[in-house]
Amino acid sequence: LEILTGQYQVIVFKHCYPVSSIKPDTGKPDVSSNEKRVENYKLQYEALKTKMRSFPATRFIVWTGAARVKKATSRDEAERARQFFTWVKNDWDEPGDNIFVWDFHELETEGGLYLKDEYAVSKEDSHPNKSFSMKAAPLISKRIVDVIQGKGDVASLTGK
């Protein structure tokens, strides 16, 4: 981040859909673990928040993770993913700092658990299709502009 914050005033973090393949917690969270578990993600996000706040002149936009199509995940994994992204929006993200969220997961799922079939490349492929991408592109653009204009804490997290 030291290099990027020296070059950019706004930095956007994006995850690919495998971030949503969340396994059950073990009761032994580990910030250094590469295991995809809510307990680990929360510690990692808290560490990331501390680091990002050490660059107050830079604004950071964190996408909620991408959803998976129903055929590519289990209901339990999808529920854990939604639980984590809800925590990111409602608890981790705090007003008044330099960190903002774009709720991509909400756009993909429309409040459900899975990437909607009509937004996916196919019922087996969790990549967003061209039609959905064309719908989402102006929304992330609007979200970025809202953050730049100082409206990041009051504007819609989806860009709608």
Question: What annotation goes with each model-predicted range?
Answer:
Residues 31, 35-39, 43, 53-58, ...:
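A surface/extracellular/periplasmic glyco- and lipid-processing/surface-interacting theme
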Residues 68-160:
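Catalytic His-Asp segment of secreted/periplasmic serine-dependent ester chemistry enzymes
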Residues 1-8, 49-55, 146-154:
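Surface-exposed acidic, glycine-flexible loop patches that form ligand/cofactor-binding
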Residues 6-12, 53-61, 95-100:
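Loop/turn elements at helix/coil->beta-strand transitions in domains of secreted/extracellular proteins
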Residues 17, 48-83:
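Active-site segments of SGNH/GDSL-like serine hydrolases
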Residues 1-38, 65-70:
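Oxyanion-hole/transition-state-stabilizing segment in secreted/luminal serine hydrolases
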Residues 32-48, 77-88:
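Well-ordered, non-membrane alpha-helical segments in soluble/globular domains
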Residues 2, 39-46, 50, 138, ...:
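Amphipathic, non-transmembrane alpha-helical secondary structure
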